[in-house]
Amino acid sequence: GKADEIEGAKALQNSMSLKETETFLRNATPGELLTAYGEANPKRGGMTRVFNDGYVMGKEGISEPFVNDQMPRVPIILGTNRYETKLFNMMNRRFVRWGEGEGIFSWIGVDELPLEIMRPDFYNAVTQYSSDSWKERAADTPARQLVASGYKKTFVYRFDWDDLPVIQGVDYGVLAGAAHALEILFLFPAAFDNFIIKNVVIRDSYDGAKKLSDQMLSYWAQFAYTGDPGKGRSNDLPKWK
């Protein structure tokens, strides 16, 4: 590098012109750029950060396209799962006691499973508040901003499915229902034919889950074709409003 320590690097960077900065970055290798990004602070401080470079991302930040009606726009679907943060809370040992898997789980190599939600009311409260905040920031507010700025091709959903079984005494509907990433299963219907998913994860809810998957795929395919989920590709579902 051009500096031996952080303060010297900051001073050097602040003294560089935009052209010098551009030249320096364009001459860096992909490996150097990714290494610097990976070592940036705060580490593990959240999702990948967005840089307001004024080109890829507007100078006003990631929310600018939602309020600036002069920027190019395309139809958009925004959405979250009802209990997004359950995926993370269930792995927090302060909330959930984990232990050795039994029966088929031991046989297929699952070393640990959730055995008890230690404080269910607290677990549910933490999940509700944090998931509601996620929904407000990721779906509701951007959608309202788009509509308020005159853009009507804006659609919102919430994924609520939580019909999961009881496993080793733990109600997985409470533990992980409608959690982050659970909806992905419904977008790849071949997964429903997987033995573990069909007979362990979904069990008695298979028919309902498959129907929901078919409806989601129909709406989303129609959106991809036309920019409006409407009544789905089959044109026989409730109109998305």
Per-range role (PLM):
Residues 2, 34-36, 152-157, 226-238:
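Acidic/polar loop patches that form or flank catalytic/metal-binding clefts of enzymes
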Residues 2-24:
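Short, charged, surface-exposed loops that flank catalytic or proteolytic processing sites
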Residues 5, 139, 213-217:
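Short alpha-helical patches at coil-to-helix transitions and adjacent helical residues
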Residues 5-10, 235-241:
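Surface-exposed intrinsically disordered loops and tails
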Residues 19-207:
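Substrate-gating cap/lid region and adjacent catalytic-acid/histidine neighborhood
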Residues 208-231:
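Non-catalytic, well-ordered alpha-helical segments in soluble enzyme domains
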